[in-house]
């Protein structure tokens, strides 16, 4: 039987545990690099879901470990931007390892004399071969184009890279590193519960989601990456207009689009007064406002995972409901995701190698 998008979502707990167990080996090259020279400024080259994964992970680098991270879209970087000579480390993120724009961005950085690490699911891919150091995401290649397991694995690897850099440069004690790893292991273990909770939530609200013609997700901080990946997954699978916004950015114009057809998701780790105030305000203007939270709640319009996490780790769990809802909503709308569309797109547009 061919795997589906849901097959890979259900494999996430095992995949993440494997990454956690083997990360000292799979990330050995970046640990050795950081032991030889100081690393304080990083450049991440990523597009699509890889860009969203970088948004999810950046908070851990910056707020917890004091490592400055710039995230650049490769095409724009190649044609319209310059290489910052103060950059200490460059990581090109591409699950397939075939992104033509990411490859071009790597070559631009290397021409400026900066070494490039490639974080990819295929070390033998074009990007893996061109990189100076290759880091295996350690999940293999998904046979479904709408990546889920690979997305979560990319987020986890980026979080572990942040921890590895901090540990290699003695910015944290081993006890703190072990505590974070334990939290991540606990997080992986509750993913089956999060999947079940989301399935029940979908069953309660199937009519609303099945008939939805415009979807919007809103997050903040690291959860902006979750909202943006919601946008990517719903656009790819549900195939109606779908957007993900940072909380404050939504308040500066996009709210004016709201109408009675909109279905909105508000994403939080812990109760957030500003996010909830926006949800309350928008409730009368749109079809439905849902809250997705790591805290407890009895409200039937709230998907409460009841598993508190620090903000900089929360995206790794909160992305799971977005993935499940994309799959279930697409299926409810009768979309057969096993049927490829725009099959010649990459060949004609040369977006992938």
Question: What does each model-identified segment do?
Answer:
Residues 2-39, 133-135, 141-262, 334-353:
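Active-site phosphate/pyrophosphate-binding segments
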Residues 6, 17, 55-58, 62, ...:
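Predominant activation on well-ordered alpha-helical scaffold segments within soluble catalytic domains
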Residues 26, 35-186, 220, 255, ...:
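Glycine-rich phosphate-binding loops that contact phosphosugars or nucleotide phosphates
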Residues 167, 240, 270, 288, ...:
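Short, well-ordered loop/turn and helix-capping segments at boundaries between secondary-structure elements
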Residues 304, 308-353:
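Peripheral docking tails and interdomain loops at the edges
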């Amino acid at each position: 039987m061919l795997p589906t998008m849901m097959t890979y979502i259900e494999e996430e707990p095992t995949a993440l545990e494997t990454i956690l167990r083997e990360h000292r080996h799979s990330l050995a090259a970046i640990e050795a690099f950081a032991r030889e020279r100081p690393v304080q400024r990083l450049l991440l080259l990523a597009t699509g879901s890889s860009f969203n994964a970088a948004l999810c992970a950046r908070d851990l680098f910056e707020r917890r470990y004091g490592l400055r991270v710039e995230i650049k879209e490769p095409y724009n970087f190649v044609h319209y931007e310059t290489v910052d000579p103060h950059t200490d480390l460059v990581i090109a993120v591409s699950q397939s390892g075939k992104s033509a724009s990411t490859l071009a961005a790597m070559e631009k950085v290397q021409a400026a004399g900066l070494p490039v690490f490639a974080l990819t699911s295929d070390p033998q891919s074009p990007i893996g071969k061109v990189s100076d150091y290759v880091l295996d995401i350690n999940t293999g290649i998904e046979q479904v184009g709408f990546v889920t397991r690979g997305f979560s694995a990319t987020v986890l690897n980026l979080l572990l890279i942040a921890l590895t850099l901090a540990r290699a440069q003695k910015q944290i004690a081993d006890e703190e590193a072990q505590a974070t790893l334990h939290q991540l292991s606990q997080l992986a273990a509750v993913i089956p519960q999060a999947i079940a909770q989301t399935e029940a939530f979908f069953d309660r609200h199937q009519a609303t989601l099945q008939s939805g013609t415009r979807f919007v997700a809103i997050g903040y901080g690291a959860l902006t990456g979750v909202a943006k990946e919601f946008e990517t997954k719903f656009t790819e699978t549900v195939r109606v207009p779908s957007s993900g916004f940072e909380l404050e950015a939504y308040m500066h114009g996009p709210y004016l689009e709201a109408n009675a057809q909109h279905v909105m998701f508000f994403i939080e780790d812990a109760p957030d007064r500003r996010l909830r105030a926006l949800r309350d305000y928008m409730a009368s203007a749109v079809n439905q406002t849902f809250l997705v939270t790591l805290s407890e709640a009895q409200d039937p319009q709230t998907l409460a995972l009841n598993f508190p996490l620090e903000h900089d780790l929360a995206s790794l769990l909160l992305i799971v409901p977005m993935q499940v809802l994309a799959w279930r909503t697409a299926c409810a709308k009768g979309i057969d995701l096993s049927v490829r569309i725009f099959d010649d797109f990459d060949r004609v547009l040369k977006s992938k190698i």
